[in-house]
Amino acid sequence: MASQKPHLNLITIGHVDHGKSTLVGRLLFEHGEIPAHIIEEYRKEAEQKGKATFEFAWVMDRFKEERERGVTIDLAHRKFETDKYYFTLIDAPGHRDFVKNMITGTSQADAAILVISAREGEGVMEQTREHAFLARTLGVPQIVVAINKMDATEPPFSEKRFNEVKADAEKLLKTIGYKDATFVPISGYKGDNVTKPSPNMPWYKGPSLLQALDAFKVPEKPINKPLRVPVEDVYSITGIGTVPVGRVETGVLKPGDKVIFLPADKQGDVKSIEMHHEPLQQAEPGDNIGFNVRGIAKNDIKRGDVCGHLDSPPTVVRAFTAQIVVLNHPSVIAPGYKPVFHVHTAQVACKIDEIVRTLNPKDGTTLKDKPDFIKTGDIAIVKVIPDKPLVIEKVSEIPQLGRFAVRDMGQTVAAGQCIDLEKR
């Protein structure tokens, strides 16, 4: 049973042409849940077009076209299993989507595969550095490096070339703080060393890519952190009372607990908790729950409030300092700019009061102090003042409530995380 295995969110990162899609295709087709009839259709079509080798990249492109044409291939098919785990692949097509998904935590990745091409003239490139730095900054705890296109080295499957690329990648990962990455030579296109050892690389004695993925660790549930339940909705149920609904991000909630909702500043006692219409004696991180609170009326609290225990209440800020990445802004962002910040379930207009400094995306060192403005692609430290009280936490303390997206003009213009705060 798949659901009995621990589940990990896995993100594939790396330069756009280094073979991510091919590798993802290979994993999904060999171990995933793409229905056999779809594979068969592709196989026939590939043969007719003289692509009898059944090129995975081509299949992935078809996959993409079908999605674009609105023939949805359910996201459930982006899952694959190993002996030990059940993985969901968060494939990041574009650089911007990748950063946005990563930062907003809609898909907090538990681990990453960094794909680097071993082909001459490729190797560690600009985007490789940026993706790796962002993965680290945004809290992806563990990484496996897939040194891809080993079939395209000179000569093919060259141990010397593998060692060169590995040395560069190792240096990069050490500078940004990944201590113990595994480096695996593969060919996503030909399938070498993806699921089983390759006869073409007898010199390599390490794990296959799948074995390396199985060596990842399961993240621990943050049950020892203070309780935080961002409110998604509030219902008033006849005969029961006020029932807020939301997902437990950190900590543990039990019937009988004394809780406070902030910034609403309303207190109450938890009478009962339900998940999927079943009573719960204890709610833990990841649980989507409804809970009945005595002493609170439906209109006292709303979406965006956060529930915590009375003795360690959620943090309401007057201002905070954030590290942001500008993803997509048509002009420039200067002090005084006031977009909408999406933090957990809250949406609050916030003013960028000061641009403290910009950072080098490759290593996080300071580029410029107090610049006049920032633009798409920049990483900056900024001071932010919300229009009204807002709950946000330091990413170093409760990362689940420390990340946010910045929206304006119908798009995500930036994303970031809270690194310091001034309590209200």
Curated annotation (Swiss-Prot):
Region feature (G2): 70-74
CDD domains: EF1_alpha, EF1_alpha_II, EF1_alpha_III
Localization in the cell: Cytoplasm
UniProt EC number: 3.6.5.3
GO molecular function: GTP binding; GTPase activity; translation elongation factor activity
Region of interest: G4: 148-151
UniProt: GTP binding residues: 14-21, 91-95, 148-151
Reactions accelerated catalytically: GTP + H2O = GDP + phosphate + H(+)
Region (G1): 14-21
Annotated Gene Ontology cellular component terms: cytoplasm
Record-listed Mg(2+) binding positions: 21
Keyword Cytoplasm recorded: yes
Keyword Transferase on entry: no
Family statement: Belongs to the TRAFAC class translation factor GTPase superfamily. Classic translation factor GTPase family. EF-Tu/EF-1A subfamily.
Role of this protein: GTP hydrolase that promotes the GTP-dependent binding of aminoacyl-tRNA to the A-site of ribosomes during protein biosynthesis.
NCBIfam families, per database record: EF-1_alpha (TIGR00483), PRK12317.1 (NF008969), small_GTP (TIGR00231)
The protein, known as: Elongation factor 1-alpha
Annotated organism of origin: Thermoplasma volcanium (strain ATCC 51530 / DSM 4299 / JCM 9571 / NBRC 15438 / GSS1)
